[in-house]
Amino acid sequence: MPELPEVEVTRRSFAGAIEGATVRGITVGKPLRWPLGTEPAVLVGRRVCGVRRRGKYLLLDLDEGLLLIHLGMSGSLRFARDLPARGAHDHFELITDHGTLRLHDPRRFGAVVWAAGESDPRARKLLDGWGLEPLGEDFAFEAFHAGLRAKRTPIKQLLLAGTVVVGVGNIYACEVLFLAGIRPTTRACAIGPQRARRLHGAIREVLARAVERGGSTLRDFSSADGSAGHFQLEANVYGRAGLQCRQCGTPVRLSRQGQRSTYFCPHCQRA
């Protein structure tokens, strides 16, 4: 599933090119996870004012309303003036005078939803309840630590839930906890101030580095300009079960936690 770094990389890869564009048409394919929420003709003539990100959602601000885009489990966006003919898994196109934005989504768990604004019930249903933005200025340690103290959930599962901090997917949760030296099964409320600060810093560091590397391409992710990500090539623990820890030489372990694969070093992450 594309996580925060992949979504941010996608945003950066086409935001400048589409800003100021006028919508000329909409192409809708097979049904996605949620319906568009308006007739496609309503969007024709609208101008794209900018592209933002909230967690794993992209927000295309229009001069009237906005489009919320979620990439689902296997989705990706492409933006270009001349795209090849639509394929069987291309389910949405926003055609503008700057180029076409196309959603490719083989499993159709993604969505493009129109809303009148962020206070629209459709937008609130998707955006409300998410935690702090880890790459934003409001990712304050005090609020983050308060969120940890209130939960008895194992820290790895709390990171994945997105209610305290948003967008930390499985690969990044494993890498963050390794960098912070915290065992994935440790209860969030048991993490004291010193370790919480290490965790807070590790979240920023890992996600920022992932964005710089273009995200992670584990199967089929690419940004809107077709570029693959490379973060997975330098992972310390994720995908390295049985291999020596890059830091101490202990074999990396693999376990199942909340139906997800968890990679950790038993020596570097003792508690």
UniProtKB/Swiss-Prot annotation:
Zinc finger (FPG-type): 236-270
Amino-acid positions noted as binding DNA in the UniProt annotation, renumbered to this chain: H89, R107, K151
InterPro entries cross-referenced by the UniProt entry: DNA_glyclase/AP_lyase_DNA-bd, DNA_glyclase_Znf_dom_DNA_BS, Formamido-pyr_DNA_Glyclase, FPG_cat, MutM-like_N-ter, Ribosomal_uS13-like_H2TH, Znf_DNA_glyclase/AP_lyase, Znf_FPG/IleRS
Highest taxon listed in the record's lineage: Bacteria
GO biological process: base-excision repair
Residues annotated as the enzyme's active site: P2 (schiff-base intermediate with dna), E3 (proton donor), K56 (proton donor), R260 (proton donor)
Cofactor: Zn(2+)
Keywords: DNA damage, DNA repair, DNA-binding, Glycosidase, Hydrolase, Lyase, Metal-binding, Multifunctional enzyme, Zinc, Zinc-finger
Entry's Gene Ontology molecular function annotations: 8-oxo-7,8-dihydroguanine DNA N-glycosylase activity; class I DNA-(apurinic or apyrimidinic site) endonuclease activity; damaged DNA binding; zinc ion binding
Enzyme Commission number, as recorded: 3.2.2.23, 4.2.99.18
Record field: catalytic activity: Hydrolysis of DNA containing ring-opened 7-methylguanine residues, releasing 2,6-diamino-4-hydroxy-5-(N-methyl)formamidopyrimidine; 2'-deoxyribonucleotide-(2'-deoxyribose 5'-phosphate)-2'-deoxyribonucleotide-DNA = a 3'-end 2'-deoxyribonucleotide-(2,3-dehydro-2,3-deoxyribose 5'-phosphate)-DNA + a 5'-end 5'-phospho-2'-deoxyribonucleoside-DNA + H(+)
The record's free-text note on cofactor binding: Binds 1 zinc ion per subunit.
Subunit structure: Monomer.
Family of this protein: Belongs to the FPG family.
Protein function: Involved in base excision repair of DNA damaged by oxidation or by mutagenic agents. Acts as a DNA glycosylase that recognizes and removes damaged bases. Has a preference for oxidized purines, such as 7,8-dihydro-8-oxoguanine (8-oxoG). Has AP (apurinic/apyrimidinic) lyase activity and introduces nicks in the DNA strand. Cleaves the DNA backbone by beta-delta elimination to generate a single-strand break at the site of the removed base with both 3'- and 5'-phosphates.
Protein name: Formamidopyrimidine-DNA glycosylase
Annotated organism of origin: Acidovorax ebreus (strain TPSY) (Diaphorobacter sp. (strain TPSY))
Gene name linked to the record: mutM
